[in-house]
Amino acid sequence: SGKSTLLGALAGLLPGQGEVRIGGESLVDLSWPALAQRRAMLPQRQPQLFHIPVFQVLSLGLDEAQSAARQNEAIQALCQALELEALLARDFSRLSGGEQQRVLIARTLLQVWPSLNPGGRVLLLDEPLAGLDLHHQLALLRLLKQLAGQGLLVVLAIHDINLAIDWADRLLCLQQGRVVREGGVELVDEALLAQVFQIKTDRIEAGGRVWFMPSL
């Protein structure tokens, strides 16, 4: 617990102790428009009532200073990566929960998409994999890995420890709102999982990868 609160504080949306800096700038010194240029955040999914086509949902909030051609190029690239092309003309309110989640993820990504906002520094996603099937989880994780490789700091709150080990560079493990482990994925072990999740696990290694499975 505490993941959503931590992300909210990192985004400058919730008060917290200490100081958060993005690119050397303190959040408290940034105006709301400047903060929106530096970071984007997707909160945990809540019901949305957009009775408009998906392409309009994606266009909401885009910088009008950007050319329509550049905006459309970014939207098309995201829709291809997240497999949203077939949904662009559909009414957002009639989509399934998983489809809506993918659209909202794409909308958040557009806020810090490199070709539209070179000043984007941080992407915060709270449970972005919720409601997505395995195929679309993998598509999203591949895209996020690509963006991280281009210099964007990507912070995810997820529950699946095996996905975190596979895809993360660093882990921050919380228990009751307190940090109990921070560092590389190699720090995850059976003792940590027993402490945080109160379960016994078995470590499985194959093909250079590691999984932790609940003991039967």
Residue ranges and their predicted role:
Residues 26-40:
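ABC ATPase NBD coupling module
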Residues 18-26:
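Conserved ABC transporter NBD signature motif
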